Amino acid sequence: LARVRGDSLVYDPMCGSGTIVIEAALKALNIAPGIRRRFAAQSWKCFQNGVFDEVRREASAQVRRDAVFEAFASDIDPEAVRLTRENAAKAGVAGRIHVRQADIKDFAPEIPEGRKGILITNPPYGERLLAASEAEEICRTMGQVFPQRDDLGYYIISPHDDFEGVFGREAVRRRKLYNGMIKCQVYMYFNSRRGEKA
């Protein structure tokens, strides 16, 4: 839903295992899904020798090596930071993702003049890792520390119907989706004056 491009700056201040920033990097760099994986079908006799290698070469030729994409991932949990680094390395995008341990309260993006940032995050829901009251407090904190800027759009995934009230701002747009079996919404905040998406 967020328009991630080769020149995007993507932020996830609650990165967990790094899924969002890694997927954003793969999209921005036009890296084909599974390009680094080995598939069981590669050993099937019905495929000609070299077919998988040929497809990989074709996909590799499509990678955007000229892209200036960068992602900035952080999490308060040191294990999440470790996992994000490890997963980014496995995906081949570690050089494009800056990872650090940080509290959401300290979120302060530095966006160079003329560029636009996109914050995409999936904060805790208060179902598995935290109590509902702790998850609500995180949403309230996000509303306080996420600046309203023309050069930064927000895409926040939440299952809570009252998210906008807790966050303190009404979304410009909302989109229903399922995160596994959990019914959620993506709350989108961007410069509504010009109708632009970051």
Predicted regions and their residues:
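Conserved S-adenosyl-L-methionine
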Residues: 1-108, 127-128, 134
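C-terminal catalytic and target-recognition region of SAM-dependent MTase-like enzymes
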Residues: 103-198
